[in-house]
Amino acid sequence: MNRILSVTFYLFFIYLYIYETYGKVKNTDKELSDIYGTKYYLRSGFFNSKKCKGHKYEDLQAEGEGENDKEEDSNNEEMNIDEENGLIEGQGESEDPAKASQGGLEDPAKASQGGLEDPAKASQGGLEDPAKASQGGLEDPAKASQGGLEDPAKASQGGLEDPAKASQGGLEDPAKASQGGLEDPAKASQGGLEDPAKASQGGLEDPAKASQGGLEDPAKASQGGLEDPAKASQGGAEGHGKHAPNKENKNKNKESIKNIMNMFI
């Protein structure tokens, strides 16, 4: 008999534990109980403390409202940021065009001086010392005259340490330097052109045009580039008679000058 009582006693406590842990409890909220009915809760122990899944409907609803509030707050923040950006853009567009053309400076004189108030300092590139300004910001006049280089010899050689290399235009190979930087001697003698015929024609592909000094019209070429034959025969002078050049008079003048020079000699 005692054994039966002890077994039933233990079974009763096991039943209570199972009921309290996985028991079926109705929702206490009447409005929600009509909608959702009964819900299972996961409890811990005998004190009905909710754990993990043990949330009431009103708790779930409050959590949902909290999430909605967070979303509204984030949306409001984004709207505020957009409004601030719009105001900044509006201010940038509504600024004075004259001020905008002056780099944001209100004073035109200051804007023309690169933001400097002193005109003399502005003309000296922001330097207070006129001598230093004339020397490109260098304190040593000798160094300034040498392009910022301390060694006069190096300065005279264009910044190159090797005099031979400096005399060759910075090229190490003397042959290449004498050929204008070209490796092919034939190409160098042809002015950088690969075709000898084109090189002999001054870079022109048409031999006839090359023999005419680059002019397409043979008649114009024979007249020294002048379109009027009469003007060409007069050496480019437009006038006739006493204004036209006289070759015989020129030759006579030259001979008389030579005779006078011979007399003095």
From Swiss-Prot:
Residues of the region (13 X 11 AA approximate tandem repeats of P-A-K-A-S-Q-G-G-L-E-D) are 97-239
Localization (cell): Parasitophorous vacuole
Residue ranges under compositional bias (Acidic residues)?
60-86
Q: What is its main location?
A: other
Q: Where are the sequence repeats?
A: 97-107, 108-118, 119-129, 130-140, 141-151, 152-162, 163-173, 174-184, 185-195, 196-206, 207-217, 218-228, 229-239
Q: Is-annotated flag, keyword Signal?
A: yes
Identify the stretch(es) annotated as Disordered. 59-265
Q: Which residues fall in a coiled-coil region?
A: none
Its GO CC terms are: symbiont-containing vacuole
- Fetch the InterPro entries from UniProt: S-antigen
Query: In the record, which residues are listed under signal peptide?
Result: 1-23
- Name the job this protein performs: S antigens are soluble heat-stable proteins present in the sera of some infected individuals.
Q: What is this protein called?
A: S-antigen protein
Q: Which organism is it from?
A: Plasmodium falciparum (isolate FC27 / Papua New Guinea)
